Amino acid sequence: MDDKPNPEALSDSSERLFSFGVIADVQFADLEDGFNFQGTRRRYYRHSLLHLQGAIEDWNNESSMPCCVLQLGDIIDGYNAQYNASKKSLELVMDMFKRLKVPVHHTWGNHEFYNFSREYLTHSKLNTKFLEDQIVHHPETMPSEDYYAYHFVPFPKFRFILLDAYDLSVLGVDQSSPKYEQCMKILREHNPNTELNSPQGLSEPQFVQFNGGFSQEQLNWLNEVLTFSDTNQEKVVIVSHLPIYPDASDNVCLAWNYRDALAVIWSHECVVCFFAGHTHDGGYSEDPFGVYHVNLEGVIETAPDSQAFGTVHVYPDKMMLKGRGRVPDRIMNYKKERAFHC
């Protein structure tokens, strides 16, 4: 039985304000097809670039063009580093993105750090922090240079926030640095396995090397931005490579301190949805506080005859994801206004 909602049929109920594109885990490499670590799922390394091309052509030809595209991380595969092809593969993907007629906001995932150091990424075309919007007279909403996160306003009364899920991580960091030592200590405290990418026997399986977490500094900043959005009655979309809600994700793929991120988000009224990648399988759930968690299906594990991307149409009362291929359609109604008591 197909209970998939039909956004086209429901879109007449209110005027569309704007739209934006979403895509995750392209993981391009100029290699023949392979499999995941367990050898159970095929990965289409070379064809992923053609999927990206198809998505860009689709967005460019939409009757109401998206205002921007959110790229949810893992844009090239870690295998590139083994073949000394990281820069070349990134250049091919970025050349493809040049065909897109709207801005793209890039999130960083584990595969970015398999290929490049954090310092390299900070000075690369994958750093789209220059697209941020600064809130005048509110310095507390300015992100630190210590992590890669920012916010922007695609449309009045809507704010998008990109988070750095590898702010706490042993990936892409100088191994002689205090930050590396701090993050390795966190990882070792929760994961005694010799192979740190293995969740075997862990009570908290998210503590593996291919995941990361949010520093307290970044969470404090997120809290300040959400406080501003609450006060100014903005609707907020949050983006991260790593998911933070267990019901929408494999537990092995969650951010290390996902509970801390949820605690911040749940203390505010303004957040509509949280987009993530990383799982490749996709996932979806509405949490008890009315926040929708959308984990996008990964391009890398999408067969040549399918697709994996979407366009989110934004209305005064809801957001509607129109998926392509493996990505299902979703309807995300805004929370009903709660009464404020003095």
From Swiss-Prot:
N-acetylmethionine modification, residue list: 1
Cofactor: Mg(2+)
Gene3D superfamilies per record: 3.60.21.10
EC number(s) given by UniProt: 3.6.1.13, 3.6.1.16, 3.6.1.53
GO function terms (MF aspect): 2',3'-cyclic-nucleotide 2'-phosphodiesterase activity; ADP-ribose diphosphatase activity; CDP-glycerol diphosphatase activity; manganese ion binding
Annotated catalysed reactions: CDP-choline + H2O = phosphocholine + CMP + 2 H(+); ADP-D-ribose + H2O = D-ribose 5-phosphate + AMP + 2 H(+); CDP-glycerol + H2O = sn-glycerol 3-phosphate + CMP + 2 H(+)
List of residues binding Zn(2+) 2: 74, 110, 241, 278
Keywords recorded for this protein, A-Z: Acetylation, Hydrolase, Metal-binding, Zinc
Binding sites annotated in the UniProt record for Zn(2+) 1: 25, 27, 74, 280
One cellular-component annotation, GO: cytosol
Pfam name, any one: Metallophos
Family affiliation: Belongs to the ADPRibase-Mn family.
The protein's role, per its UniProt record: Hydrolyzes ADP-ribose, IDP-ribose, CDP-glycerol, CDP-choline and CDP-ethanolamine, but not other non-reducing ADP-sugars or CDP-glucose. May be involved in immune cell signaling as suggested by the second-messenger role of ADP-ribose, which activates TRPM2 as a mediator of oxidative/nitrosative stress.
Assembly: Monomer.
This protein's name: Manganese-dependent ADP-ribose/CDP-alcohol diphosphatase
